Amino acid sequence: VRATLERFAGAYRAAGAPPVVSATKGFDETTLERMTEILAELWRAEHPAALSGPSIAPETARGVPTAVTIACADEARARRFQELFTGDAFRAYTSDDVRGVELGGALKNVIALAAGICDGLGFGNNAKAALITRGLAEMTRLGVALGAHPQTFYGLSGPGALMVTCLSPQTRNRPAGERLGRGEGVAHLLGCS
């Protein structure tokens, strides 16, 4: 991710450094930085925003009703993004907790892998529901320890994103976890064997 963003940094600045919103739900694999941290560093983006929530791309593209949170330290910019993104089937809510929205979007992927493993092992819905519920509690604890607001983890970028990622076969992480639970090796899963 960092290498790609570095390639476009000059073009971003040449375009006048417009407001930017990240929909990436993860961390840099080397530095563990959140995407807005990387955008601020490499692009010198001022108040980069983050978008997260229960938003599976194929459903959103089909116009299925979708709601997300857009977080930005600049409240006026968050509202402007909200206006730009909100339409008939897509609703954006705002937050000032960029860190929490990004952490919710990233941490839910770990829980989704575990939920898939539950499915692959045949543990049933009771175990999966307990895992998802306890996973949300752990996401919240870690997020708060890293400086996020606890209430962020009870919104669209918390249980909203967590539920869709843990329950939908259209996401990557839950099906990957299911394959792991059935005994497929990580190397095979990643296409390395």
Describe the function of each predicted region.
Residues 25-27, 52-56, 74, 96-101, ...:
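Glycine-rich beta-alpha junction loops
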Residues 1-65, 81-83:
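Rossmann-like NAD(P)(H) cofactor-binding subdomain of soluble oxidoreductases
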Residues 18-20, 97, 185-187:
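Glycine/charged-rich beta-loop-alpha catalytic/anionic-binding loops adjacent to active sites
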Residues 108, 112-119, 144-193:
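NAD(P)-dependent Rossmann-like dehydrogenase/reductase catalytic/cofactor-binding core
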Residues 4, 11, 38, 42-46, ...:
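Internal alpha-helical scaffold of NAD(P)-dependent oxidoreductase catalytic cores
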Residues 49, 70, 165:
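Glycine- and other small-residue-rich loops at beta-strand/loop junctions that grip anionic moieties
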Residues 23, 123-126, 187-190:
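Short coil/turn segments at secondary-structure junctions
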Residues 33, 136-137, 174:
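A generic alpha-helix surface/boundary motif
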